[in-house]
Amino acid sequence: MSLARTLARRAAVQAVYQWQLARDSLPDIERQFVEELQLAKSLYRRHAEGFELSPPEREQLEELLEKFGRSQGTDEVEEEDVTLEQRASQCQVPDVQVGYFKELLHGVANNLALLDAALAKYLDRPIDEVDPVERAILRIGCYEFMRRPETPYRVILNEAINLAKEFGAAQSYRYVNGILDRVAHECRAVEMAARRRG
């Protein structure tokens, strides 16, 4: 599991969520996220090299690390009590595979009918009634099952579960796991059978 891909999925969930709710244009959403990623990398690098950031830059970096950085396991500290230094030391550099982020964002949007049809067989309600965070995660996971056969299904499933734990409601990871596991059995039948045999 590549950290850069994990962070690309994390950014894609947020971008797909934004697209689902606001229906902003994909190029606008993509541009916003790519610009924010570039700014996060630049500010993080300057901070890590010991350069003094201005108060607005520090605030931006804190927000961007929260949005794009992946925590390495923080203590039980209230989010608003975490200083920039603590957050930076507890986060991995926001080194997102931008190409993969773009593929996921556009792949979901361009294959929406196909993805929703594959998911609908296993949903307990219409796709539009699924929580928007869960819906974004399900669509991205389904896209990867269908279009990224080189990525093992367990990686895709585990990443989706982790995203649901991070962004979703308390038990949403169970729902995401149940739906995507069934989709995997359909889309990755050969891989699943080989795993059971071996």
Swiss-Prot record:
Involved in transcription antitermination. Required for transcription of ribosomal RNA (rRNA) genes. Binds specifically to the boxA antiterminator sequence of the ribosomal RNA (rrn) operons. GO terms for molecular function: RNA binding. Belongs to the NusB family. The keyword S-adenosyl-L-methionine does not apply. One of its GO terms (biological process) is transcription antitermination. Keywords: RNA-binding, Transcription, Transcription antitermination, Transcription regulation. This is Transcription antitermination protein NusB. The gene is nusB. It comes from the Bacteria. InterPro entries: NusB-like_sf (IPR035926), NusB_fam (IPR011605), NusB_RsmB_TIM44 (IPR006027). One of its GO terms (cellular component) is cytosol.
